[in-house]
């Protein structure tokens, strides 16, 4: 008996050794346990039960083999009409739960092109039969199919009170801990985009909570980028976690993934500096080539986020310059706008933009030309072929300017004023009372910005076009509003004001924060007599003010000085050249009879003591007067 038992166990162990390599770890442990139990079992244990126990892991292994596609699966995928799918229910095919779910998913896809047919589908008897079949076997639907199924039911417009929809939602809740991270993300996107019902929003909140808790499960860059694009914007805590994960995996990103992350950040206006720095490093250091689409999107994202990285900007400009012959007019306009937002003036690239416009003068559309013109004005760029370029601009605008959106008309004329290319007819078009009245008293930020540009256009006509006969903005419109001085005080502004107060000694010897009728605010204004002494500025006539306070004429030989501080954002990136807007401001103030005392941030930062700052301003004033006398 003992010998027979040992022989039997030897056979069992040999069988186990042969099956072990193909088994999962759990199966091997189970088999080892069975063998151990065989050796230690009593003689009364029925040996006949052992083969069944040993075969159990083998059966599980067979169950985990890849799914073999059946004919009905092929029919579902190839169906082009809803009727073909519904006929599968009444035919010889015996659909299981997964196939029923696949039919619903395919129906949703087909009806996305014909949304008017959804109502008829929901009333179809076969459709209700399909829902009942699915509802009865929902627990056996695969995870991936379940994640797509819920979105399809939302897209088909299944009523929220439907027990089938509620059953699927409840099944999702039960399986949340088992679902893969990408399935959770897909479900969250479906709840957010395809349904606005209260019950789906509650499910969305649960899904986002799970996504926030399980963010460490993300192991590859593709999943990470997909989740960031699809559901990152739905939850601030989730987005913070995804950005942390992005920093961890960014070295594995390819050009297209870097592009997607940047576009996503730009779309959400998320200026994540650590992530942008990491992406910039890899854009500069890695040898991969960037396609035209990637270059355009990267330039747009950096411009939209106002993130300045010199090496990235240089690479973008260089690579795009080499691709100029292949760019369309729309891409040139898009690219020019991006670099204008980025405040990066690459002279060869912008000359190429101007040449592209001239080469395609007959084909370029007005919107594209407008984008290029506005970009040139922002950066104060004057092309070498200036006459030809602006002749084309005036030719295109001549008949079409009145038909454009009013705010765009103002933007274009303002841009021409910045570049000193505006014509009298164009000034008259936007300064006409019937036109500008729509912007008077505007409450929105856009209307206020547009009216501010109208003030600048009005100042251009008044100061730079001596033969201009009108119309002009009314006196009531050019009077500075309460918001003209309602701005956050910068550190440079505060220090400059304190130094000026100490320099003047008395409040009547100068004015701080002077709002002019030209739409510009002076940091300070002083009046010097012929000996260089301060005069009480408020006692004298000031034509630059909408409501002058003084009545006396300035004495002969007196000089009116305006102090203008220039902050870091007022300049082109990595340059000491002012942006077009501030070039226009300086030009207007000079034309109004002022001597300019420029106070740029890069000079002020070098001054450490109050004495140095006071001496700096005195020296600037003397130089301004000396330059005027030298003329």
Swiss-Prot record:
Superkingdom of this protein's organism: Eukaryota
Keywords, in A-Z order: Mitochondrion, Phosphoprotein, Transit peptide
Record InterPro entries: FAST_2, FAST_kinase, FAST_Leu-rich, RAP
Cellular component aspect of the GO annotation: mitochondrial matrix; mitochondrion; ribonucleoprotein granule
Tissue: Ubiquitously expressed. Expression detected in spleen, thymus, testis, ovary, colon, heart, smooth muscle, kidney, brain, lung, liver and white adipose tissue with highest expression in smooth muscle.
A molecular function GO annotation: RNA binding
Sequence ranges assigned to domain RAP in this UniProt record: 561-619
Record-level GO BP terms: mitochondrial mRNA processing; mitochondrial RNA processing; mRNA metabolic process; positive regulation of cell population proliferation; regulation of cell cycle; regulation of mitochondrial mRNA stability
Keyword field contains Zinc: no
Main location group: mitochondrion
Cellular compartments annotated: Mitochondrion matrix
S-S bridge residues: none
Stretch forming the transit peptide: 1-107
Residues recorded with modification Phosphoserine: 553
Family the UniProt entry places it in: Belongs to the FAST kinase family.
Function: Plays a role in processing of mitochondrial RNA precursors and in stabilization of a subset of mature mitochondrial RNA species, such as MT-CO1, MT-CO2, MT-CYB, MT-CO3, MT-ND3, MT-ND5 and MT-ATP8/6. May play a role in cell cycle progression.
Comment block on domains: RAP domain is required for TBRG4 function in mRNA stability and translation.
Protein's name in the database: FAST kinase domain-containing protein 4
Classification of source organism: Eukaryota, Metazoa, Chordata, Craniata, Vertebrata
Gene: TBRG4
